[in-house]
Amino acid sequence: MESELKDLNSNSNPPSSKEDRPLLKSESDLAAAIEELDKKFAPYARTDLYGTMGLGPFPMTENIKLAVALVTLVPLRFLLSMSILLLYYLICRVFTLFSAPYRGPEEEEDEGGVVFQEDYAHMEGWKRTVIVRSGRFLSRVLLFVFGFYWIHESCPDRDSDMDSNPKTTSTEINQKGEAATEEPERPGAIVSNHVSYLDILYHMSASFPSFVAKRSVGKLPLVGLISKCLGCVYVQREAKSPDFKGVSGTVNERVREAHSNKSAPTIMLFPEGTTTNGDYLLTFKTGAFLAGTPVLPVILKYPYERFSVAWDTISGARHILFLLCQVVNHLEVIRLPVYYPSQEEKDDPKLYASNVRKLMATEGNLILSELGLSDKRIYHATLNGNLSQTRDFHQKEE
């Protein structure tokens, strides 16, 4: 797809005659084209002060603020964040030093043959307690360093859900009219909307769950060991053998394990499959819902005035730079009650996913969108083409 998009956006063999060359669009035409794209691909469009792809233009006052932050906040925050990362890596290294990693029964096929999932999340005892508690604490400290000094968390009144969905409560009335409390079912997964890589830090600080990650993450310096302590599910999307179970199969097993085994790590899933600008909720993939177990919906919102921390069209380097430059960042969290599926939802994962998605959109005041990752890639490729035309236009004017 990427090669096709490149063919659409550029010509490898430009015409030799000047008359045959396509005229460059005026700057106003390009601005109108980008505005039209933003409307079509609204879930991925940036609406903050930093503009499309974070490229501005910036007001003079903003340039001054960025210049001051570059020589004050950025170096300090960078050093502190790297120190925290290194400290937690050392904690994980020390407390897993004489422990063999857990090798799950699930297998995946890659170029090197059959490989096993490996993690330290199945450890028990005081060593595991130290890893989890220090991980949660340092994740919150890291968010503080990034400017998230306060995180507002809210839990909608669970009592309001008792009439509409009796399964959301574990308290029943016995024959004598007394409240008989039963132990609630453990959710098989936490499901959340996906706005930024910062989502992971929040969830680590709140519940320290496992995540789905590329297999290459497990081999990264520092982060690789930390991901194993989280119990990440590593996937190799390029591997497709006859026995390959795929991402859904592996996730399904982990969800069932987390639901039935209290000592197993809870798994955290972003069913949208990609990030948005935080105002929309994309179509959910069914991986978190195939097992038919209860899920815990969590909604993350990042209010902003200048720079939006949503990771939509902006590059990773620019995003981190502007994040470190912003003095204060905001995060609001809505933790919904555990959602217990009906029998109909258990039998139909798509219905289950759709109903949870609608609930999250209603409670989080999010707009439903049917776009997906492929649309985001098209949007990015088209934006890159238009912006390259803008650069050509300015060069011609000069």
UniProtKB/Swiss-Prot annotation:
Residues 163-174 have a biased composition (Polar residues). It is found in: Endoplasmic reticulum membrane. The keyword Endoplasmic reticulum applies. One of its GO terms (cellular component) is endoplasmic reticulum. It is a single-pass membrane protein. Its EC number is 2.3.1.23, 2.3.1.51, 2.3.1.n6, 2.3.1.n7. Pfam families: Acyltransferase. It is an enzyme of class 2 (transferase). SMART domains: PlsC. It comes from the Eukaryota. GO terms for molecular function: 1-acylglycerol-3-phosphate O-acyltransferase activity; 1-acylglycerophosphocholine O-acyltransferase activity; 1-acylglycerophosphoethanolamine O-acyltransferase activity; 1-acylglycerophosphoserine O-acyltransferase activity; lysophosphatidic acid acyltransferase activity; lysophosphatidylethanolamine acyltransferase activity; lysophospholipid acyltransferase activity; plasmalogen synthase activity. One of its GO terms (biological process) is phospholipid metabolic process. Keywords: Acyltransferase, Endoplasmic reticulum, Lipid biosynthesis, Lipid metabolism, Membrane, Phospholipid biosynthesis, Phospholipid metabolism, Phosphoprotein, Transferase, Transmembrane, Transmembrane helix. The modification Phosphoserine is found at residue 28. It catalyses: a 1-acyl-sn-glycero-3-phosphoethanolamine + an acyl-CoA = a 1,2-diacyl-sn-glycero-3-phosphoethanolamine + CoA; a 1-acyl-sn-glycero-3-phosphate + an acyl-CoA = a 1,2-diacyl-sn-glycero-3-phosphate + CoA; a 1-acyl-sn-glycero-3-phosphocholine + an acyl-CoA = a 1,2-diacyl-sn-glycero-3-phosphocholine + CoA; a 1-acyl-sn-glycero-3-phospho-L-serine + an acyl-CoA = a 1,2-diacyl-sn-glycero-3-phospho-L-serine + CoA. Optimum pH is 6.0-9.0. Residues 1-24, 158-185 are annotated as: Disordered. Possesses acyl-CoA-dependent lysophospholipid acyltransferase activity with a subset of lysophospholipids as substrates. Exhibits strong acylation activity on lysophosphatidylethanolamine (LPE) and lysophosphatidate (LPA), and lower activity on lysophosphatidylcholine (LPC) and lysophosphatidylserine (LPS). Exhibits acylation activity on both LPE and LPC. Has a preference for 18:1-LPE over 16:0-LPE as acceptor. Palmitoyl-CoA (16:0-CoA) is a better acyl donor than oleoyl-CoA (18:1-CoA). Among several different acyl-CoA species the best acyl donor is palmitoyl-CoA (16:0-CoA). Belongs to the 1-acyl-sn-glycerol-3-phosphate acyltransferase family. The HXXXXD motif is essential for acyltransferase activity and may constitute the binding site for the phosphate moiety of the glycerol-3-phosphocholine. This is Lysophospholipid acyltransferase LPEAT1. It comes from Arabidopsis thaliana.
